[in-house]
């Protein structure tokens, strides 16, 4: 073989080797890319909500195509407000007021590409997946033992005879506590409302709970006679035969929605996240409404026992800033 032919042959071998290396690297990186294309879902939902969403995604063929991480409302809210669209998540389910506030700050969500038949109007970038409504609940046996009249209002829980016998959620830790504060401010205004809250907190004493489910647990256990929390939990407890009753307070039943939104990463994963969002809205609701019985979409119905008698909305839009104002109001009332 001549020197020139030898060089040509070597050059050809080197070229083929280089090409094979490129294909090997592309194959390796594409497998990593496949991994990175999994939709990352952040949610503040509890176990029942997560189960409903995952069932819908699995039935739609998305098993193995997403990674779901559950975070507390304050933790996920903090990440949204600090990181904006740099957040790892492609899809979030979260308290609607946090979605509104993070959108105002960062414009981080993509308009939803699908339509729904929601009963109320919502921004173009999210739709509700569930709603929670506040109410009073009581342990009927403890009321009898203590000779207490069933309360008709939040203000009734400030009476001296209820001292040490009331449990409420702390607005500093739980959004359920915000439902109570909204009711007090709406009915009594800030001046009288502060006194009502002061007297209520004094009666609550050590029964101020960090979890929205804390009060119903204490009422069910008979540790206190009355509490404020999520209405559907009291309805469920009563239906199970527990000595629990629910009371729609005269100040009103206020609600908070949790919604789904797609973070606009402007890539193929964003498109897949959008399809998953549509699946959750359209397929998970049948399970979600069972555990959170508030009708949000046309055609949905709930039993009469799940319809609050005093359903109300706060006069101002719910935002993180308003929550912080009401947290200060609560602390100042102590």
Residue ranges, per PLM feature:
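Short, low-complexity disordered leader/linker segments with a strong preference
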Residues: 1-39
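Conserved N-terminal structural module of periplasmic/extracytoplasmic solute-binding proteins
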Residues: 31-88
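Extracytoplasmic ligand-binding site segments that recognize negatively charged/polar headgroups
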Residues: 43-51, 71-74, 88-216, 220
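A ligand-binding cleft/hinge motif common to bilobed small-molecule-binding domains
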Residues: 97-103, 220-221, 225-243
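A bilobed periplasmic-binding-protein/Venus flytrap-type ligand-binding module shared by bacterial periplasmic
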Residues: 137-142, 257-268, 288-291
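Periplasmic-binding protein-like
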Residues: 165-172, 197-201, 208-209, 240-264, 279-301
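Extracellular/periplasmic bilobal clamshell ligand-binding domains
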Residues: 303-334
